[in-house]
Curated annotation (Swiss-Prot):
EC number: 4.6.1.12
Similarity field: Belongs to the IspF family.
UniProt-recorded name of the protein: 2-C-methyl-D-erythritol 2,4-cyclodiphosphate synthase
Top-level taxon in the UniProt lineage: Bacteria
Organism this protein belongs to: Syntrophus aciditrophicus (strain SB)
UniProt-listed Gene3D superfamilies: 2-C-methyl-D-erythritol 2,4-cyclodiphosphate synthase
The record's free-text note on cofactor binding: Binds 1 divalent metal cation per subunit.
UniProt KW Lyase keyword: yes
Subunit structure: Homotrimer.
Site, Transition state stabilizer: residue positions: H34, T133
Amino acid sequence: MRVGCGYDSHRWAAKRKLILGGVEIPHEFGLTGHSDADALTHAICDALLGAISEGDIGFQFPDSDPAYSGISSLKLLSKILEMVDKKGFAIDYIDSTVIMERPKLMPYIPDMKSKIAGVLKMPSDRINIKAKTNEGMGFVGRQEGVAVFAVALVKENQD
């Protein structure tokens, strides 16, 4: 078994959609980024890449490459699943924490889990998403942006 840790953060931006876990969440702001800026999916991507020793999302999908401009992060996650499979691993479990002051995410978490599970071809009960605030502290507390942490557990395929 291997463990990977992931982290991502993005600034708030006007005139952008807020996408987390592949789900569009109604909010006055979205997040800045070269892709759809889905910080939750990006952190999960980094956790998986770490678990298989394949760098990070910026290395695999550089923001200097126009092919990734505006791309759905779920498509990137799908490509990473292929890498996990090719390296002889299977995803066992994912845990993540989204840190933002608002909006409240609880109503959207089941849909996020379902979308991520669908892409990763695994049961949604093997994916956990927690939503926290930063109690008004730091850049998240000042509502300048969002931060996400993720951990992925992978195991060697037994084929």
